[in-house]
């Protein structure tokens, strides 16, 4: 992390399974076991996804979401369900377009062994919301609101089974507890963090008829403290 950048440029990248480039900004995903955990990190929960929508990428229709003691990780199935894909975050664009049989074969070869992988570290998470399904209008799709280097970034996923208010309450407990463990001063946000950690926070009604959980404390102080903790346990 540099003095100039405390938050991510983007929320994911398309790479080969097992790639370990820029580990603070992007997760490493193993083809068989899923995300590679960092030293001291524990896996808490995972579920299958039926839809993944991230700015800068085509919508993906299968993957998994993982929650650990440090981050929320999203990974697609092997990246072979579309003919076009892109990536954000300073690693350049990856484009595969197929118009003929030959170009389709070349594109397929380029996609082989690749996966979309992204994570939201808890120190970047502004909040999250349950949104109404576009067809049934029932609550279920999950939107993560993430502080990015250039502003707020949204990632939206749909789970199988659906995400619930009980699950969101649990996620609030995990994120708030991790944030408070950093030992920084959250000022007026301290009380709400305590409510989230205790599971007693009442979510807000959103403008589209969903429910929202705002997590106070995202900022320079929190990001630096979390990065120092990560570097202490992860860097050689």
Task: List PLM regions with ranges.
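Acidic, Ser/Thr- and proline-rich intrinsically disordered linker/docking segments
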Residues: 2-9, 73-236
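Compositionally biased, intrinsically disordered low-complexity regions enriched in proline and serine
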Residues: 25-27, 46, 228
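Polybasic, Ser/Thr-rich intrinsically disordered tails and inter-domain linkers
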Residues: 1-34
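A broad, low-specificity signal marking well-ordered, structured residues that form hydrophobic/aromatic
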Residues: 43, 65, 142-144
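Intrinsically disordered, low-complexity, compositionally biased regions/tails
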Residues: 14-16, 22, 44, 102, ...
